[in-house]
Amino acid sequence: MNKLVYSALAITLCSVPGIASDNWSSLDQELNSLSASLQAQNQGGPKLGGWLRSAFRSSSDLQTGGSDIQGFELNDARIEITGDAGNTYSYKISFGVETGTAVLKDAYAKWEIANGVNGKMGRYKVAFFQSSLIPESRLLFIHRSALGDIFSSRDEGFEISGEFEQIQYQVGVQNGTDGQGDEYRFTARVRADLMGNGTGKTEGAYGSGDETNLSAAVAWQDEGSLDDGMVLGAEVQMTSGPFSVAGEAADFDEGTAGAFGITNGILDQWGIVGGDVADTTPWGVTGSYMFTDMYEAAVRYEDADDTEDTTSIRVAVNRYVAGHDIKWTVEWQTVDTDNAIDDFDVLGLGLALSF
């Protein structure tokens, strides 16, 4: 009897590891399947990102509500959703919520038309200057350049883009100032990487490497709803070790009856109404130097080429906590103008954080 009991116990004990082994094997397979599923979701599903930018401004020359400017501002609170939809199609949707209300920025689909040729349709930023295409979180200063601001608007339309070796191009058509009317805004841009790997979508020398990188571009735009609505643009950017330099210029046609409907970019950044950009050739140049791995000094000079002789000088120092993802910016700007507002200086301290 005891032999039978012992034999039964032995058989049971021997069979348990086999059952457990089968169970663990099944569990491993389920975990591996779940892991693969999550990886697939992470690769093709929506990705959330964005940035926050805020600043403290001080000026004894500019006023708000009858008092000198000396307070805080929220420059950007951006939320971006991007992802792959499959079959070479991808998408991007972004909102600005700094005003307390969500404002649609980008909303477009992008797909591959042919090898090296892409299509884009929806609401997107016009491709004209590099300074307007660079995200606000990757700037050297608290504000964009004046020309970068002018050409950073978004509109609904269709764009074809591509690249061939060191050449990149964009050709697009958007609704323009008459909305869904029968006149369109046409834009074309060609950019070439002339040395090294070219410069990326970041202002300044941070992260550019030790080699010399040089890029240049020309752009053309025609606003069909204006009698003479053509704009020509040219730009160049270079980085070499700790140094960077960039320049840009635009030539505006006469518009309709001498008006383009766009005011002086330097003054417009401060809510000041200046002269129209029609029949002007504004330009600007920027230089920077990284004097340590964490600090970069920059200076920018801009000339609006307007009847009010408006010019601007900006000087800034960036402190990179985690590159452009977390950085502090100390900035001083002086504007010389014959506008009724007269000359003014502004001090600023900004913080930018990307996620």
Please provide the spans of the model-predicted regions.
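Outer-membrane beta-barrel and related beta-rich outer-membrane complex signature
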Residues: 62, 133-135, 257-261, 342
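A generic beta-sheet turn/junction motif
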Residues: 114, 162-166, 238-242, 319-323, ...
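Outer-membrane beta-barrel "beta-signal"
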Residues: 186-197, 319-321, 326, 343-355
